[in-house]
């Protein structure tokens, strides 16, 4: 896959069939990412899984979900996503692509399709996640900057969530060296969030990589950010959590990383602080 990736205009018929099947599974009511990934693993692709829906029971997926797929109730929302991706000529990575990241593919609820902007070669780089507080101390920011800079210089892509605070420090420190950073969005690939993040988004698109599993045009929704955290950890060999609050997305990422058999490291805040 080249730097520009598999944009809509360059998808062949087989890829478009796989993409449509991936959307069918994504939008099939009651199926979920875990079952969709199980089907793709069992049958070899999303397209093969859709064609073999009468055999879903063999893959451990409820036959009622196959019946739901057969109703076609998913077609409206799938078509909306298809059209939006076509309209923006989105760069699309499919489960069947040889450049789909091996680490990400290994997680139990790996996305069947995601969208990208930037340097797709980073998908083949070893990744390490740096996440943490939006209101980090000077010490926390310094640690995140130092670790991100050093790891990036060693050829490791720094993975984070494009939020303010530690996320932004990690991305900027990685890009300042050799441009090895991946930002995982909780919005559509074409949606800027936070609104004041334009400079960071531009830098990531030019020198790093942005990815999102959500349909183009998806606006910020609180429930989507914890969902994307499994991809942050899934792309990474390990996760460094810097000064995370007791109830935070960073600790969700840490828990998911442990479930994915990743290494987890922590930099706590001051002893009497909540982080």
For each predicted feature, which ranges?
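Short, small/acidic-rich helices and loops at N termini and domain boundaries
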Residues: 2-98, 266
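Glycine-biased, small-residue-rich flexible motifs in mid-sequence functional cores and linkers
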Residues: 2-16, 86, 92-275
